[in-house]
Amino acid sequence: MNPIAEFVKENRKAAGLTQEQFSLRSSLGLRFVRELEQGKETVRMDKVNVALAMFNAQTVARKKENK
């Protein structure tokens, strides 16, 4: 699973929120929340940052690790 999707889903559940409640509190659409948690690859970063801000988190750019 996508690490951002996993983070949002785990923290939403830990906060005791349904997807609908999270959607309302964050002012994000329910469809977006569902797609984000399902790991959709093409989501708007501004909305991702709104979702992460609900848990006092943000996206950070870093170089990929060589495998």
Segments and roles (model prediction):
Residues 41-42, 60-67:
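Short, charged recognition helix plus adjacent turn
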Residues 1-13:
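A short, Lys/Arg-rich alpha-helix, primarily the initiator
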Residues 10, 14, 54-57:
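Conserved amphipathic alpha-helical interaction elements at protein-protein interfaces in regulatory
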Residues 7, 18, 44-47:
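Residues that mark the N-terminal boundary/hinge immediately upstream of a DNA-recognition element
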Residues 17-34:
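Short alpha-helical DNA-recognition segment
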Residues 10, 20-21, 50:
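Surface-exposed charge patches
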Residues 46-62:
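DNA major-groove recognition helix of helix-turn-helix/homeodomain DNA-binding modules
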